[in-house]
């Protein structure tokens, strides 16, 4: 898949992360009783980046968890006969906490629906909010993010690629055309 355009470079990503962190602090009137949970895979480094920015502003650490939604997806049978399970790691109680789910791209809303199902199996949060780096539209479910790094209108024939240093060795967001015969 060849990138046809870079829509965010590292500086733009960091500005968006900083803004999201400030918006989270403002909306929640601080960070007491707050936790971030990154959706595997690229939501995890984003959650860590947001937590670092929050710590820099508030002087308090916010717990960060990892949520694997693989077994909660409604397209599991289409993914693979043997899906790769990365594992959920939430080392703190989520019951009665304000949880901010973090993901890289919001598209149809199905990933977030699966994440909410997985989260509810882990406890009963006081509130669940959603932070995404990219909102590309095309929702199939009534899901709306609370915090957005950038709105990027796309066609269904395009794919948004978020590349993060922790996984990809570079921080940027690009758009590519979907290859014929490949379903995204």
Swiss-Prot record:
One of its GO terms (biological process) is DNA-templated transcription termination. It catalyses: UMP + diphosphate = 5-phospho-alpha-D-ribose 1-diphosphate + uracil. Transmembrane segments: none annotated. It is an enzyme of class 2 (transferase). GO terms for molecular function: RNA binding; uracil phosphoribosyltransferase activity. InterPro entries: PRibTrfase_dom (IPR000836), PRTase-like (IPR029057), PyrR (IPR023050), PyrR_bifunctional (IPR050137). A motif (PRPP-binding) lies at residues 99-111. SUPFAM superfamilies: PRTase-like (SSF53271). Keywords: Glycosyltransferase, RNA-binding, Transcription, Transcription regulation, Transcription termination, Transferase. Its EC number is 2.4.2.9. Belongs to the purine/pyrimidine phosphoribosyltransferase family. PyrR subfamily. Regulates transcriptional attenuation of the pyrimidine nucleotide (pyr) operon by binding in a uridine-dependent manner to specific sites on pyr mRNA. This disrupts an antiterminator hairpin in the RNA and favors formation of a downstream transcription terminator, leading to a reduced expression of downstream genes. Homodimer and homohexamer; in equilibrium. This is Bifunctional protein PyrR. It comes from Acetivibrio thermocellus (strain ATCC 27405 / DSM 1237 / JCM 9322 / NBRC 103400 / NCIMB 10682 / NRRL B-4536 / VPI 7372). The gene is pyrR.
């Amino acid at each position: 898949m060849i990138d046809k355009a870079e829509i965010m470079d590292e500086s733009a990503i960091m500005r968006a992360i900083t803004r999201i962190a400030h918006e989270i602090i403002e909306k929640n009137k601080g960070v007491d009783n707050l936790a971030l949970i990154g959706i595997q895979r690229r939501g995890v480094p984003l959650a860590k980046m947001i937590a670092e920015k929050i710590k820099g502003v508030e002087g308090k650490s916010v717990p960060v968890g990892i949520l694997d939604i693989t077994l909660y997806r409604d397209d599991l049978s289409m993914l693979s006969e043997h899906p790769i399970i990365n594992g959920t790691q939430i080392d703190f109680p989520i019951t009665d906490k304000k949880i901010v789910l973090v993901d890289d791209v919001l598209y149809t809303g199905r990933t977030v629906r699966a994440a909410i199902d997985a989260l509810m199996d882990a406890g009963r949060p006081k509130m669940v909010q959603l932070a995404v780096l990219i909102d590309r539209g095309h929702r199939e479910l009534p899901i709306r993010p609370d915090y957005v790094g950038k709105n990027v209108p796309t066609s269904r024939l395009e794919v948004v690629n978020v590349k993060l240093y922790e996984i990809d060795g570079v921080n940027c967001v690009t758009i590519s055309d979907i290859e014929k015969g490949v379903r995204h």
